[in-house]
Amino acid sequence: MPSGGRGRPRLQVGERSLLERPSPPKRRLIPRAQLLPQLLLALTVASVFYTIWRIWHSQTEELPLGRELRGPLIGSLPEARVRRVVGQLDPHRLWNTFLRPLLVVRTPGSPGNLQVRKFLEATLRTLSAGWHIELDSFTASTPVGPLDFSNVVATLDPGAARHLTLACHYDSKLFPSDSAPFVGATDSAVPCSLLLELAQALDQELGKAKERAAPMTLQLIFLDGEEALKQWGPKDSLYGSRHLAQLMESTPHGLGSTRIQAIELFMLLDLLGAPNPTFYSHFPRTARWFHRLRSIEKRLHRLNLLQSHPWEVMYFQTGEPPGSVEDDHIPFLRRGVPVLHLIATPFPSVWHTSDDSEANLHPPTVHNLSRILAVFLAEYLGL
């Protein structure tokens, strides 16, 4: 996931053509007695139109452009509900049950990769909400020879019209055999454990949403082969996301739609777990949802529901990101999917080193992120 600036196209204003000199307007003298009623009538009509315009504008100004116009108009949870959602999260379970089994070398095609993939599947199958779990398995040519990859796709209700999709990659980067073991704690064991904890903590609410056939459902995607095997490039990276996006684009979903068109919002989690992360909105289309996360962070801080979180370490920042990032969202973004990229930028100092381990994680940050995301999911899905 190399970072670097990428030019953004700017809208260019065309030259205005010269206008011919207009002919002098015809005038007529209006007696003063007739002028006042006409002015009052004009002001009344203008006031009515202005009121109508303001009502319409207030209802639409917060809506982004494009496919996301059909997104839900969500409201904030009452304080009691916020506290209940946060209370359903279990920091011990997140860390010991979900995270630690992922902290192994898990390069594509390795025994560790298979072990982690089976762990993800088994964990999702234990949830009472009843997830529909699919494997997208394929073989791809790589710089180190043909390799087998498998994406894990868990959809709460496959029949729902729209999907809120949370994604992360579960493979770890390949290093020379004489290198120290690389377990990729932030990259991306922590994101995977966050997804599992969210599904477990909200299990009952998600099950009820499925029973009532809510039009919006939750989808979790665990991608294989994000990391380059030799050198990052368009053919040596994003193996799993490239394959899955193409597959979803060609798979029908409902009448006249495809599975990729069913994704209303694609949230990609990456490089999470180091202390004091900063996140930025990378795409105007999803800025609305980024600012919702920022608002939730502020609210949880005010309610004293975040740990080791003074105001000066706010995670969700305003302003431009330090640079663009190539990651698993790219194949989906290119197909028109709205993307919210939750990645720490600048990258953690341990990025792509053997120090990206459990010892260098910051537990309060991990648990704070789980709380922010849990409230976001509860609000977005109406749980």
From Swiss-Prot:
Enzyme type, top EC level: transferase
Gene3D superfamilies (UniProt xref): Zn peptidases
UniProt main location, coarse: Golgi
GO biological process, one term: peptidyl-pyroglutamic acid biosynthetic process, using glutaminyl-peptide cyclotransferase
UniProt entry tagged with the keyword Glycosyltransferase: no
Subcellular location: Golgi apparatus membrane
Record-annotated active site: 226 (proton acceptor), 270 (proton acceptor)
Coiled-coil ranges from the UniProt annotation: none
Region (Disordered): 1-25
Pfam families, sorted: Peptidase_M28
Tagged with keyword Chaperone: no
Swiss-Prot/TrEMBL catalytic activity: N-terminal L-glutaminyl-[peptide] = N-terminal 5-oxo-L-prolyl-[peptide] + NH4(+)
PANTHER family: GLUTAMINYL-PEPTIDE CYCLOTRANSFERASE, GLUTAMINYL-PEPTIDE CYCLOTRANSFERASE-LIKE PROTEIN
Stated family: Belongs to the glutaminyl-peptide cyclotransferase family.
Function: Responsible for the biosynthesis of pyroglutamyl peptides.
Identification of the protein by name: Glutaminyl-peptide cyclotransferase-like protein
Protein source organism: Bos taurus (Bovine)
Protein's gene: QPCTL
